[in-house]
Curated annotation (Swiss-Prot):
This is Undecaprenyl-diphosphatase 2. Catalyzes the dephosphorylation of undecaprenyl diphosphate (UPP). Confers resistance to bacitracin. The gene is uppP2. Keywords: Antibiotic resistance, Cell membrane, Cell shape, Cell wall biogenesis/degradation, Hydrolase, Membrane, Peptidoglycan synthesis, Transmembrane, Transmembrane helix. It comes from the Bacteria.
């Protein structure tokens, strides 16, 4: 991998990780259109350490409170009813599905799931689901001619069942094209949460899974000796900087804007990929590395 490739791929990772458009799909597509080798699941996992570092810094006050309360709840029974302590447990519970499936489906994630036809299908299907979820949220928030506005759930209302729903949605993002934030936010909206609450828990929920995946891939990459460490680290730093900027923008955006622009973008991109593959302009396995 060249330094230019790492710059572009790092930017793509940072700019798309927190938007409901699938960063893994965009990394895969960028490489395919540029004629580069598929950066692979390992590169994606390692550079995601950079974007999760951005989450740690942006939500540092929330995370510090949650960690402190969670540890205190281990020795103080009264603390177990504290919202921040419960949030710590709910992040752990919500991380179980992706942990189990990530290990079980590792070979599929690094192989068959990276077919561009699957990526395109997931972009469209999950785009439609996000659109439905967004419409339901908007209807509850504004009401209608014959119905009053409905109060939506906030993070204080999160429970184990809902945490597992979020977690199951996050696990779906192991397939390129799904989008971690898109799937979890869609799931949260469908079970009644506000846009901001769904997004906030989505970002917090990703921390354990992404960091664990990144460390796991780092270990394997170091053992294989086939990683261009300089460009990979550079891409991770670029992903961190651009990712932080996107989080700050996105949290403001969702406070009063619809997700529909992302929905139409996903659908249009998915259709374009299918058309390019169908006409032979793009191979479904384009840019895959020999390994």
């Amino acid at each position: 991998m060249s330094w230019f490739e790492s710059l572009i791929l790092g930017l793509v990772q940072g700019l798309t990780e927190f938007l409901p458009v699938s960063s893994s799909a965009h990394l895969r597509l960028t490489a395919a259109f540029a004629g580069w080798e598929d950066p692979g699941a390992a590169f994606t996992a390692i550079t995601q350490i950079g974007t999760e570092a951005a989450v740690l810094i942006y939500f540092r006050k929330d995370i510090a409170r949650i960690i402190s309360a969670w540890f205190r709840s281990l020795v103080n029974k009264e603390m177990r009813h504290d919202h921040d302590a419960q949030m710590g447990w709910l992040v752990i519970v919500g991380s179980i599905p992706i942990g189990v499936l990530g290990v079980t489906l590792k070979d599929q994630i690094e192989g068959p799931f990276r077919d561009l036809r699957i990526t395109a299908t997931m972009l469209i299907v999950m785009g439609v689901i996000l659109g439905i979820a967004d419409r339901l949220a908007a209807r509850d928030e504004t009401g209608g001619k014959h119905r009053a506005a409905k109060e939506r759930k906030k993070l204080q209302d999160l429970n184990i069942r809902d945490g597992l729903v979020f977690g199951a949605c996050q696990a779906m993002a192991l397939i390129p094209g799904v989008s971690r934030s898109g799937a979890t936010i869609s799931g949260g909206l469908l079970i009644g949460y506000t846009r901001e609450s769904a997004a906030r828990y989505s970002f917090l929920l990703a921390i354990p899974a992404v960091l664990a995946s990144g460390v796991f891939e780092l270990k394997d990459a170091a053992a294989s000796g086939h990683v261009a460490w300089g460009p990979t680290v550079f891409a991770t730093v670029i992903a961190f900087v651009s990712g932080y900027a996107v989080i700050a923008w996105f949290m403001k955006f969702i406070s009063n804007k619809s997700f529909m622009p992302f929905v139409w973008y996903r659908i249009a991109l998915g259709i374009a990929i299918i058309a390019l593959v169908a006409t032979g302009a793009l191979s479904p396995h384009a840019a895959e590395s020999a390994g």
